Amino acid sequence: MKRFFVLPLIAAGYLLNAQTIGNSPYAAFGIGDVKYDNTTDISAMGGISTAYIWDFNNNFNFSNPAANKNLELTTLKIEGSNENNFFKSNNDNMSVTKHSSYLSNVTIAFPISSKVKFGMGYQPYSSKKYTVLTNEVLGSGNTQASLYRGEGTISTVQAALSYQITPEFALGLRSNFFFGNVYDINELTFSNAELINGYETKNKVKTFNFTLGTAYQKKLQKDRKLTLGATYTLGTTGLMETSYINSTYYYTDGETKNNVSIIEEKFSEDKNLIPMEFSVGAGYGKDTKWFVGTQLDYKKGETIQFLGQPFVNDNSYKVSAGGWYLPNYNNFRNYFSRVTYRYGAYYEKGNLAFNGTNINQFAITGGMSFPFENRSASRMSGIDLGIELGKRGTLDNNLIRQNFINVKIGINFADKWFNKRLYD
């Protein structure tokens, strides 16, 4: 049977009528919708992290492992995300709303010495879950039905080490281990046919790469400071196993395949699943009072097998700006003077393009960090809140516009767990 392949996103109306869509319809392609976005506080500042060194002693920066000179406490962070997506298409003026919640970050970090800091963490890296059913009446009078299904999650476990070479300059190294499975299938049938033609791709991921980081912070007059940073993430050094099967069959009991006849079967191993990334950033601020920074991220496009065919991701970049403001961390008479207020925005030229149209993204962000009231600001456990309002995609060329409101919450427990005081 000759394969009839149609990218489901091109038919926006069909996709919006889908029975199940993941957090974004664009997750149907490649390894899914990338969820990796670091911690709640960094997300609330537009994602600036490369030149971000927190002024206090209770936070570890995993995005740039070199930017951790002030960490003095053991910190345990547990964070969750709630995503609210609103999809719209000009095709019959259709709209769909989707919600999801998930555990987005678990990390622990502590100082080994005054110069060496270490952290470990878990985050989901990407995910997909979609079901798309399209029907088309052909000129012959027969009906062609295509079912697209996909699901899976890729997660990452990280270990990061920071070394302060001088009071102003530091280096860092982070190892990233990726694991998980991603599955896609396209099933095609006709009203006058007994068999279904299925094109199935399974990607098994068990791979790793490394991120190198540098950070430089110069103290200036009047408690001002200048911070510079850069990171470089190597492309994947492990392998992704991909199996592809083109076969015909029919179902019994709705799930069991019978009379399976394999037309084509392929197996491959690729090293280019996780792309090379590069980031530079700069920031300026006043000690324990305020900070503002900007950042440029670049990600190299890679090719991945999608339903038996190579799917090319374009090179992408992201421009971010943001910062924080703390009114008075020593004012214990006014609690909200000790709350940290965060703000930011970003624009991302995405790695997907359809009909010559790039799928880009823009968002504004904000958030607050609430210290536990019975702690001093220099030894601060607390709760982080973040919000992100933005848009992805476009209504042009029969595509889909995705508006989103994402809410993040995290709890940071910070204390000298391994070096308790003898007297309180």
Residue spans for each PLM region:
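Bacterial Sec-dependent N-terminal signal peptides
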Residues: 1-24, 424
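Subset of outer-membrane beta-barrel
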Residues: 19-424
